[in-house]
């Protein structure tokens, strides 16, 4: 076991605070409409440019191990805020730095760290309740666009795209962000159910100009196994040929003789057929086949339930108004399923989401809900260079998560104003600690709540104290604040400067939680650096060569 290096008391806390300040100072330059970018070096390729707090934090490692522990704990604040609400990472970092700095000053002055933490926790609990009172629902498309605009660094086009996407596919729909091939941003909405499986043979293509297959009013055969023998499908193919309707086969796989026969019959014009692999793997594939069955009023042919493909009838086939198949994706539009069955299926999946433990499972279940109910929207992000593209894509993804948070818990006035209002209300309330040290903890938290506004103002090149005091005057309007972009005072909601309540709440709670742990730290332990032993390369003479000098 490696030997350890230990630091205690103020020595430990000073080192930790130094690490906190290094990371926070790098992150907080990005805050607000006039925040700056940070350039991150990469081990290969071009550096990346970002204005996203958590991206900056994740990239920082310090050489001094004690300082690095402080930086890593602060990094956790940004990561937790990002995981919870998708935004507010820089705000959380600024709040945590302020709480740690003021808290450690109080500890150095002789206050009890545990009581300080209890005071901070009391102030934060009260602040969360006040934020809920200040919050307003966000259902209007205009407000959703404003939240997206603010989160995307005042990019109005991005805010509008996100608002349009949410309107088209509902709040539960899947919205993804992809890189565009050109310079322009755009929105593509896929109606119906789409899954990422394309045609098994290009010979099925019937639209040469788009290299795709398009069927109107097709039958849909769903099979939970590989199909390799064409004889298993003869009865179904006869029914389809007689009716003159196209057939889409969705199975685990279609291979060998079965695929070859389908291709030949399609090319001869005997039947219109296309085959694709079922989406997903394992149990997830079975569930997704059931989703398609419910959507199309079909039945999954599965040996597990005693079904046989040979005995399948027309009653087992699903139907849809239209199907479009490309080499990468299959889209089923306007399935013939009953609305009540689809809704029941959606409710069932929602219950699974509530019980799911992993983020991956939740995401996949959410996608299934969206495909059954809302559809899928793709926001295409364009930029002139790859570096700009990556930076913009990250901003749009943040903005998308922020708008979802706004719809979930509502909005509060942005620009750091909500926390200023909350702090003022708590300061004027009857909130008190059990002792004077707890009261100091409450004051530490309330002072920290001013720090986001102050940092936004500093980044805009203005005097923080003057503007903070003017905003505190309130003028009888809780929404009264300072617009750093236009350098004007006014109603933040009317000016379109909104923050999702969830983002502000999460930033404050995670900042206070981690900062409280740092304040109560008394000892830090790390591995001692290993000393590299220089290999013994000095010549001590070679055995048996003692008389070499005399050879000359």
UniProtKB/Swiss-Prot annotation:
Entry's Gene Ontology molecular function annotations: ATP binding; ATP-dependent protein folding chaperone; isomerase activity; unfolded protein binding
Signal peptide: none
Species annotation: Hamiltonella defensa subsp. Acyrthosiphon pisum (strain 5AT)
Family annotation (Pfam families): Cpn60_TCP1 (PF00118)
Main localization (coarse): cytoplasm
Encoding gene, per UniProt annotation: groEL
GO biological process: protein refolding
Catalytic activity: ATP + H2O + a folded polypeptide = ADP + phosphate + an unfolded polypeptide
EC number per UniProt: 5.6.1.7
Sequence positions that bind ATP: 30-33, 51, 87-91, 415, 499
Coiled coil segments of this chain: none
Gene3D superfamilies, per database record: GroEL, GroEL-like equatorial domain, TCP-1-like chaperonin intermediate domain
Name of the featured protein: Chaperonin GroEL
Subunit structure as annotated in this protein's UniProt entry: Forms a cylinder of 14 subunits composed of two heptameric rings stacked back-to-back. Interacts with the co-chaperonin GroES.
Membrane-traversing stretches: none
Function: Together with its co-chaperonin GroES, plays an essential role in assisting protein folding. The GroEL-GroES system forms a nano-cage that allows encapsulation of the non-native substrate proteins and provides a physical environment optimized to promote and accelerate protein folding.
Alphabetized UniProt keyword annotations: ATP-binding, Chaperone, Cytoplasm, Isomerase, Nucleotide-binding
Compartments, as annotated in UniProt: Cytoplasm
Family affiliation: Belongs to the chaperonin (HSP60) family.
Any one GO cellular component localisation term in the record: cytoplasm
InterPro entries per the UniProt record, alphabetical: Chaperonin_Cpn60_CS (IPR018370), Cpn60/GroEL (IPR001844), Cpn60/GroEL/TCP-1 (IPR002423), GroEL-like_apical_dom_sf (IPR027409), GROEL-like_equatorial_sf (IPR027413), TCP-1-like_intermed_sf (IPR027410)
């Amino acid at each position: 076991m490696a030997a350890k290096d230990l630091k205690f008391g103020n020595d430990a806390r000073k080192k930790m605070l130094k690490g906190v300040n290094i990371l926070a100072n790098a992150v907080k330059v990005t805050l607000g409409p006039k925040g700056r970018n940070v350039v991150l070096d990469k081990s290969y390729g071009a550096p990346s440019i970002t204005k996203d707090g958590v991206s900056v934090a994740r990239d920082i490692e310090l050489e001094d191990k004690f300082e690095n522990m402080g930086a890593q704990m602060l990094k956790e604040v940004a990561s937790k805020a990002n995981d919870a609400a998708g935004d507010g990472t820089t705000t959380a970092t600024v709040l945590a730095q302020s709480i740690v700095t003021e808290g450690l000053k109080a500890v150095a002055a002789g206050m009890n760290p545990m009581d300080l933490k209890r005071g901070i926790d009391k102030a934060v609990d009260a602040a969360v309740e006040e934020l809920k009172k200040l919050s307003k629902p966000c259902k209007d498309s205009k407000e959703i666009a404003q939240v997206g605009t603010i989160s995307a660094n005042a990019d109005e086009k991005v805010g509008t795209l996100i608002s349009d996407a949410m309107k088209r596919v509902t709040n539960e729909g899947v919205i993804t962000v992809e890189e565009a091939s050109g310079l322009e941003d755009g929105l593509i909405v896929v109606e119906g159910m789409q899954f990422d499986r394309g045609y098994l043979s290009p010979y099925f293509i019937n639209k040469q100009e788009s290299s795709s297959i398009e069927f109107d009013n097709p039958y849909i055969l769903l099979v939970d196994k590989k199909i390799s023998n064409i004889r298993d499908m003869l009865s179904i193919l006869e029914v389809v040929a007689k009716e003159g309707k196209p057939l889409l086969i969705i199975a685990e796989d279609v291979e060998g003789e079965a695929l070859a026969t389908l291709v030949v019959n399609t090319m001869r014009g005997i039947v219109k057929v296309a085959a694709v692999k079922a989406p997903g793997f394992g149990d997830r594939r079975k569930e997704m086949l059931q989703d398609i069955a419910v959507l199309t009023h079909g039945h999954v042919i599965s040996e597990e339930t005693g079904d046989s493909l040979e005995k399948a009838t027309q009653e087992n086939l699903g139907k849809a108004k239209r199907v479009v198949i490309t080499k990468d994706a299959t889209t089923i539009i306007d399935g013939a399923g009953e609305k009540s069955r689809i809704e029941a299926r959606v409710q069932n999946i929602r219950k699974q989401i509530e019980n799911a433990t992993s983020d991956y499972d939740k995401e996949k279940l959410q996608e299934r809900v969206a495909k059954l109910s809302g559809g899928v929207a793709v926001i295409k992000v364009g930029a002139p260079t790859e570096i700009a593209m990556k930076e913009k894509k990250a901003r749009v993804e943040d903005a998308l998560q922020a708008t979802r948070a706004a719809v979930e818990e509502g909005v509060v006035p942005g620009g750091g104003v909500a926390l200023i209002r909350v702090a003022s209300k708590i300061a004027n309330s009857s909130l008190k600690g059990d002792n004077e040290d707890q009261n100091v903890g409450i004051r530490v938290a309330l002072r920290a709540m001013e720090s986001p506004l102050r940092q936004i103002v500093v980044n805009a090149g203005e005097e923080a104290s003057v503007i903070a005091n003017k905003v505190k005057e309130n003028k009888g309007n809780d929404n009264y604040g300072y617009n750093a972009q236009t350098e004007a005072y006014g109603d933040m909601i009317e000016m379109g400067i909104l923050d999702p309540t969830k983002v502000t709440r999460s930033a404050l709670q995670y900042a206070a939680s981690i900062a409280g742990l740092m304040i109560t730290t008394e000892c830090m332990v790390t591995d001692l650096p290993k000393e590299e032993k220089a290999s013994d390369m000095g010549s001590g003479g070679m055995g048996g060569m003692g008389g070499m000098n005399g050879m000359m």
